[in-house]
Amino acid sequence: MSQSAPQLSWRLLRVWRRDWLVTRKSWLIGFMTPLLEPILYITSLGFGFRILIPEIQYEGHTLTYVVFMAPAIIATNIMYTAFMENSFSSFVRMYYQKTYDAIRATPLSVDEIIAGEIMWGATKSLMAATIMATVLSLFGLVRYPTGLGLLPLAFLGGLLFGAIGMLFTAFVKSIDMFNLPIFLLITPMYLFSGTFFPLENLPNWAQSVAWALPLTHLVSLARNLCLGTVSWMNVLVSGGYLLAATMLLVPLALRLMRRRLIQ
Amino acid sequence: MSDNVIEVREVQKRYGTFTAVDGISFDVKRGELFGLLGPNGAGKTSTIRMIYGFSPLSGGSLRVFGHDITTGWRDVRARLGVCHQEDSLDEEMSVRDNLEIFAGFFGIPRAVARDRANRLLEFFGLENREKASVRELSGGMMRRLAIARALINEPDLLILDEPTTGLDPQTRHQLWEKLARLKNQGVTIILTTHYMEEAAQLCDRLIIVDHGKILVEGRPRDLVAQFVGKQIIESSPVCEGLRRFVTERGLEHEDLGHRMLIYCKDDENIYHEITKTYCQDNCILRMGTLEDVFLKLTGRELRE
């Protein structure tokens, strides 16, 4: 039960199914947020900045601000959705509802519970990204077929940010402590990952820092997929970064949660 | 295969430097209702958790259904049900959904799950509340649902950690009746409780543990007969004359200051002698109980 090699099987889908069935009960809230969020952003930032920022230079392309910013709304939402799910929501299930304790009386391992939870977080990111991309498509802000790449990207990004959320769940003593990673990690990423302005506007050292952060790669890929300007180099570097980070952090999250839960 | 559903051998559980379970051994036989008693912090929950593979053992060996729990925990858990001390139901879900979703963890097909949920809802008198969310249920209903959920995989072994704590007497008695019926259906049950009356009524056999060790093991009635006798004289307040009498006669007793228990070991004449000479009104002759055994063995000072 406490071996260092993860004990994983397809049973993790049973945890995923549980989360799906429970979330389905309040589907309207889950559906409305990604539906309205892009509309709010586009109307506020689009109309608000239209006169201040007539156009923007991005990797040799001249774009309107809305076209530049829209893909970042999807990318940041992918980050927030999975991170929140596997930090606050997973903590509630673990600590207050004792859901994990209950499942640990069935033939499921701790690894399967946590992996199922991370997979569920990624699924939520995927669902939200699908709805948001659909809305943005109606405004002509997503090019196809490259735009379809947003779907696997959302799932991969969801796995990564879910694992990051779960890493903190493995440590925090109380639910309020999640404000710390949000303040120190998530919010700075939200502001400095090429989301609202091109990274080229930053000093060189800050650009280097930004490229070390996962959201920068998620935004870069999302933007190039939406614009139809995605290159193999882009996929290789940023996709490779996200994939490698996921393959590193998911097992780490499993390991740390095992340490927290198995006593 | 032996008749033992659970075989615990020299099992230890340590948390850092603290030893919660200190080398205990016992068996639970098929079809038995087995009690695990002890004061708070005695090691009951730690023991229970090792039985279903929730906590790894720090030492010793533990077999359930003949499987070593450390390696065969999946097979074991498929055949057992656990009702935790703390409620772990899905609050926002309905009563029925709680049962059917939990069935999913055992890989039970949906049609079978629905069928079993129907039967369990009826068995526990929850059929009229199947659509209610757990948040709307009373404490007693929640506990019934938690036990129903533990039965969704039709387990051969049911583990109940303080199932009746905090319930009113009506609900408690009703639960006892349900447990007796489950036992008649052949389910082996292991139970922890702080209610000695409950243990005395329900348990075929029990152990009393304290400081991680087993103090005694046996049938409730045998333990009462062995440690306190069938009858006890209780006097409150205690007069000096009685104190002298008890010491002179060398009677086994416990002097609690304002109250005295005299273990008269079935010698009724002692009671008549005492009431005649010392305290007509302050003395009663009553049955010895498991609670007397428990307090005698584990002491009367507060725990934790």
Question: At which residue positions do the language-model features occur?
Answer:
Chain A
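Hydrophobic transmembrane alpha-helices and immediately adjacent juxtamembrane helices
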Residues: M1-Y144, P152-Q263
